C-alpha cells in the first residue's frame, strides 16, 4: 500500500469518528473490511484507483469464499463509505462502489417428505366420499407435482385416463401436459364414482359435499388434517408434496430439465419458457423415476 493511500485511510478513519460520529466498533469494522478488500485487488490497483469492475471481482471472490449476505453487506457499506469520502475529498469523480449490491440470500427449500412417510400418508382408509376425494387429491399432488392453484382449477375433462395424463393450466396461463401415475388414476376413478352421486354446479374435478369447487383453503386444511391423523412428523401442505415429488424424481432420474418441464417452471436464463423436451421423453423419465408410477407387469 502506498504512503498516499495510507494517509487517506487515516483521514477516512478520523472522518468516520469525528464528522460521522460512528461508534468505535463500526469504524473498526469498516477499516477491517477495506483492508480485506484491498488484499483481493489485482496487482497495480489500490484503494485510490480502484474501479467498479475491480470491486465487482472482489465481491464475487468474497461470495465464492462463502461470506454470508450480511457480511457482504457490511463490506459493501465500507467500500461505499470509502468511495463517498474520496468523492468529497476530490480524489475521484465517481464512487466506483455505488450501485453494487450483495447477492440475495437463497431461501431455504422446504423439507421434503421421505418416500416411506409419503406412502404412509397416502395409505388412508375409508370409502366415504370425503376420504376418497382427499386421497385422490393427495395422490395427484404427489403423482404429478401440481401447484395448489393448478389442482384446484382442474375440471373433469382435464384428466385423460387412457393416456394417464392431466392437462394443466399453470402460471401465466401456460398449458402443459403432465403424466399421472397408476395410483393416482385409481384414486381419482374411485372418487368419481362418489362424485356422480353429488349434485354439482360445475365441471370441477374436486368438489365439496354441496357440489361446489373445492377452495384452496379447504384443500390445505384437509391435507393438514390427514398429516396429523397419519402422525407425520411435519406439517403436510400442497407445496410440500410438490417439493417431495421434485426431490424424489431428481433422486431417481437426475434429469433436471425433465423435472423442470413437469413442474412447469420457467427457465429465466433463456428466452424459451419451456424446454424443448417432448412429452414422450417426459413420460419415459416419469415412468422410470417416480416411486408410485414405475411400470409393473400386469397381474
UniProtKB/Swiss-Prot annotation:
Active site: 147, 171, 239, 242, 265, 274
Listed PROSITE patterns: CB, TYR_RECOMBINASE
SUPFAM superfamilies (UniProt xref): DNA breaking-rejoining enzymes (SSF56349), lambda integrase-like, N-terminal domain (SSF47823)
Alphabetic keyword roster: Cell cycle, Cell division, Chromosome partition, Cytoplasm, DNA integration, DNA recombination, DNA-binding
GO CC annotation terms, alphabetical: cytoplasm
Pfam (any one): Phage_int_SAM_1
GO terms, biological process: cell division; chromosome segregation; DNA transposition
Domain of life the protein comes from: Bacteria
Role of this protein: Site-specific tyrosine recombinase, which acts by catalyzing the cutting and rejoining of the recombining DNA molecules. The XerC-XerD complex is essential to convert dimers of the bacterial chromosome into monomers to permit their segregation at cell division. It also contributes to the segregational stability of plasmids.
Quaternary organization: Forms a cyclic heterotetrameric complex composed of two molecules of XerC and two molecules of XerD.
Name of the featured protein: Tyrosine recombinase XerC
Organism: Shewanella sp. (strain ANA-3)
Taxonomic lineage from the root: Bacteria, Pseudomonadati, Pseudomonadota, Gammaproteobacteria, Alteromonadales
Gene: xerC
Amino acid at each position: 500500500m502506498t504512503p498516499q493511500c495510507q494517509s487517506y485511510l487515516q483521514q477516512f478513519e478520523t472522518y468516520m469518528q469525528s464528522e460521522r460520529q460512528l461508534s468505535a466498533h463500526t469504524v473498526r469494522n469498516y477499516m477491517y473490511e477495506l483492508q480485506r478488500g484491498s488484499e483481493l485487488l489485482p496487482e497495480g490497483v489500490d484503494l485510490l484507483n480502484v474501479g467498479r469492475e475491480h470491486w465487482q471481482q472482489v465481491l464475487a471472490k468474497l461470495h465464492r469464499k462463502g461470506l454470508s449476505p450480511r457480511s457482504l453487506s457490511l463490506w459493501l457499506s465500507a467500500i461505499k463509505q470509502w468511495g463517498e469520502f474520496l468523492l468529497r475529498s476530490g480524489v475521484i469523480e465517481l464512487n466506483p462502489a455505488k450501485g453494487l449490491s450483495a447477492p440475495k440470500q437463497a431461501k431455504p427449500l422446504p423439507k421434503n417428505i421421505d418416500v416411506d412417510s409419503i406412502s404412509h400418508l397416502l395409505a388412508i382408509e375409508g370409502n366415504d366420499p370425503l376420504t376418497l376425494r382427499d386421497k385422490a387429491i393427495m395422490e395427484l399432488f404427489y403423482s404429478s407435482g401440481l401447484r395448489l392453484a393448478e389442482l384446484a382449477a382442474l375440471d373433469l375433462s382435464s384428466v385423460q385416463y387412457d393416456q394417464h395424463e392431466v392437462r394443466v393450466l399453470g402460471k401465466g396461463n401456460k398449458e402443459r401436459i403432465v403424466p399421472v401415475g397408476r395410483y393416482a388414476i385409481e384414486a381419482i376413478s374411485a372418487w368419481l364414482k362418489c362424485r356422480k352421486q353429488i349434485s354439482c354446479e360445475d365441471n370441477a374435478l374436486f368438489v365439496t359435499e354441496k357440489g361446489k369447487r373445492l377452495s384452496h383453503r379447504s384443500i390445505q386444511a384437509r391435507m393438514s388434517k390427514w398429516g396429523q391423523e397419519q402422525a407425520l412428523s411435519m406439517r403436510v401442505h400442497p407445496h410440500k408434496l410438490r417439493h417431495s415429488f421434485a426431490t424424489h424424481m431428481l433422486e431417481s432420474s437426475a434429469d433436471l430439465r425433465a423435472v423442470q418441464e413437469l413442474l412447469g417452471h420457467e427457465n429465466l436464463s433463456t428466452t424459451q419458457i419451456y424446454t424443448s423436451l417432448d412429452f414422450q421423453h417426459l413420460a419415459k423419465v416419469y415412468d422410470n423415476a417416480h416411486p408410485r408410477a414405475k411400470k409393473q407387469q400386469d397381474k
